[in-house]
Every structure is written in C-alpha cells, then in structure tokens.
C-alpha cells in the first residue's frame, strides 16, 4: 500500500508567503515520514496556489531524495511540446521521481488561457496521447486540435515509462481503460461508487492488455484525513472543509454556467452527485466526513478497511484540514501509525 498527500491550500488569514513556506516544509516532512508521493494542483483558487506546477515540482524534487512528486495539470492550457520538455527534464533530473498527473480543469483555466472549454476532453486526450507517445517516438500531431511540425523533444526520458494518471468520471474511465492507464478516484464519492467505477474500468479493459498488466495498473484514491485520539478535535476539520467547499464553489461555477457547457457532463454531475441535493455547506461537510478517515484511529481504521474493498492500493490524503503546520504533521504521523491496518489486496 502506498500513501501520498496533497497540499497548497490557503486557509483564511494566512498570507501566500506563509502558505508557500509551509508547502515546502511539509514536502520535506512527507519524505521524512515515508510518504510515497507529494501532489500539487493548480486551479486559480485558494486551494491551489502553486500556479506553475513544474517549477514547484522542481523545487521539491531538489529538496528530497526518495519522495515522488506529482502534478494535477490542466493539459489543454499549454502547448504539448512545452509541457513535454518540462516533464522530460523533471524525469531526468529527479531520476524518475516525477508523476505526470492530469485533470480537466474549470472555467477560469480555459477563459484565462483562451481555450474552448467544450473541447477540453478531446484536447486533453489528444495532448496526453501525444506527449506519452512522444517520449519514445518524438512529438507529432495529426492536426486535429493543434498544428506544428514533427519535433524531437529533449532530454530523452529517464524512465522507460513515465508514471501518469488522470482524474476520471465515466467517459474518461472508459478512455483510460482502453489504454491501460491509471485513474484517480474522488474523495467525495462513496465506497460502493468507487467499486462501480473500478468495475466499469475492468469491463472495458479488453484492449490487448494481459490480466497481469491490468492487475498492476496503479489506480489511486483521494481522501481527506484527520487522525486524533480526541475524536472531537478531529471533527474540527469541519470548519476547514466549510471554507474549502466555499472556495471550490466560487472557483468552479459548476452550479451555474458550467451546467450549460456542451461536452462537460462531469460538471453537471457534480451538482447532483457531489452535493447529493444538499444546499448548505454544513450538510456537505457532514456528507464528506462520513466518507473519509476523519476521527479517532479506530474510526479511521474502520473507514480504511472499506477502502480495501475497492482493490486500490495507492491512497492520496489531504491533511491541511488539521490546522497549523505542527497539527498537520502530528496528524500525518498518527496516520502512518494507522496505515499498517490497511491490507494489500493484491
């Protein structure tokens, strides 16, 4: 079982300088506590201050020796050759510790960078295929979404296969399964829904991949985590989650104009699926707490054993809800004490 974490949220009252300083220190602490991967995301929001993920990854990879560092890149917002140069350089200089993670993005991403949001799925899939194939054959395009001359991008890859993953709903799950690529499952869906997503992936996986290959596809799951002997203190993450949800809604606009965006069914689904009909932050937070390892070690172990049922052995955790830097690190330490109770279903 592998464990990673994700950071860079700006809590109310903290400056960007404080967030960035803490972000770097928690990256170093993650390696010291034997976490596997440290993830970064970018959304033009308070919950993703690391605007240039490749630069932030370079900083953390340079400060560590074992920690893997990964992105949640919005692929359509930059030229694939530019992004491929960045990922190849990080792959070489870190000796294979970089993970090229991909997300679809929100309205602000596309409006600021001048990309049509309705075409984002097709562009994401095209750019991802182009970049991953290009690490072996050189970069070329069929001209459907972008035009440029064929080019060899340097340096060559350090790893034979650069680690990659993508956040997924049903259409993306099918696309990833057809290619034998790993998906990232959300922290805001139930265990039964995660199992259903895995079953969908497995149902469409017959694309020339062996059973052994599919068995070892490294899917990951995201969770909010707060482990404390004092169950009441752990429940205090509700205030943090309330602020997070509010910034999420403000950033994505998923409850208004995104609902009318052609080809963006995922955002439409978020309104009904994520909120489950709830219209206030408190009820959304209650819903989230019930799905995630928040509470005493015993409660967290119970929730984590449900995770085993999905067959996923790569877990990404959000610890920032625990408060100060010291409290975050304390909860990270307590989690690593709980972690052995997670079995490896493989």
Swiss-Prot record:
EC id: 1.14.14.3
SUPFAM superfamilies: Bacterial luciferase-like (SSF51679)
Domain of life: Bacteria
Pfam families named in the record: Bac_luciferase (PF00296)
Keyword annotations: Flavoprotein, FMN, Luminescence, Monooxygenase, Oxidoreductase, Photoprotein
Top EC category: oxidoreductase
InterPro entries, per database record: Bact_Lucif_Oxidored, Bacterial_luciferase_CS, Luciferase-like_dom, Luciferase-like_sf, Luciferase_bac/NFP
Reactions accelerated catalytically: a long-chain fatty aldehyde + FMNH2 + O2 = a long-chain fatty acid + hnu + FMN + H2O + 2 H(+)
GO biological process: bioluminescence
Gene Ontology MF term list: alkanal monooxygenase (FMN-linked) activity
GO CC aspect terms: cytosol
Chain's role: Light-emitting reaction in luminous bacteria.
Record's subunit section: Heterodimer of an alpha and a beta chain.
Record-given protein name: Alkanal monooxygenase alpha chain
The organism of origin for this protein: Photobacterium phosphoreum
């Amino acid at each position: 079982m592998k464990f990673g974490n994700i950071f860079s949220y700006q809590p109310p009252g903290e400056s960007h300088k404080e967030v960035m300083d803490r972000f770097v220190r928690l990256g170093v602490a993650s390696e010291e506590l034997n976490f596997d991967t440290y993830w970064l995301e970018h959304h033009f929001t308070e919950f993703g201050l690391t605007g240039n993920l490749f630069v932030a990854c370079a900083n953390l990879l340079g400060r560590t020796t074992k920690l893997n560092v990964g992105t949640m890149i919005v692929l359509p917002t930059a030229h694939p050759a530019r992004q491929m140069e960045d990922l190849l350089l990080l792959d070489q200089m870190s000796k294979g510790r970089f993970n090229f993670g991909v997300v679809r993005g929100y309205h602000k991403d596309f409006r600021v960078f001048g990309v049509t949001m309705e075409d984002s799925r097709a562009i994401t899939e095209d750019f991802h295929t182009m970049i991953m194939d290009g690490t072996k054959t050189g970069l070329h395009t069929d001209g459907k979404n972008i035009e440029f001359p064929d080019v060899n991008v340097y340096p060559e890859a350090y790893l034979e296969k650069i680690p990659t993953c993508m956040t997924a709903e049903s259409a993306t799950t099918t696309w990833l399964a057809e290619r034998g690529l790993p998906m990232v499952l959300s922290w805001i869906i139930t265990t039964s829904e995660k199992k259903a997503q895995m079953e969908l992936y497995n149902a469409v996986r017959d694309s020339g991949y062996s059973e052994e290959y599919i068995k070892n596809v490294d899917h990951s799951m995201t969770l909010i985590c707060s482990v404390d002997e004092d169950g009441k203190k752990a429940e205090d993450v509700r205030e943090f989650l309330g602020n997070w949800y509010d910034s999420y809604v403000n950033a994505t606009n998923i409850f208004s104009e995104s609902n009318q965006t052609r080809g963006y069914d995922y955002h439409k689904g978020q309104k009904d699926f994520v909120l489950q009909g709830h219209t206030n932050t408190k009820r959304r937070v209650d819903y989230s707490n019930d799905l995630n390892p928040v509470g005493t070690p015993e409660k967290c172990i119970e929730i984590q054993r449900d995770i085993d049922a999905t067959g996923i052995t790569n877990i990404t955790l959000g610890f920032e809800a625990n408060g100060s830097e010291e409290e975050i690190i304390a909860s990270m330490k307590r989690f690593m004490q709980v972690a052995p109770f997670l079995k490896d279903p493989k």
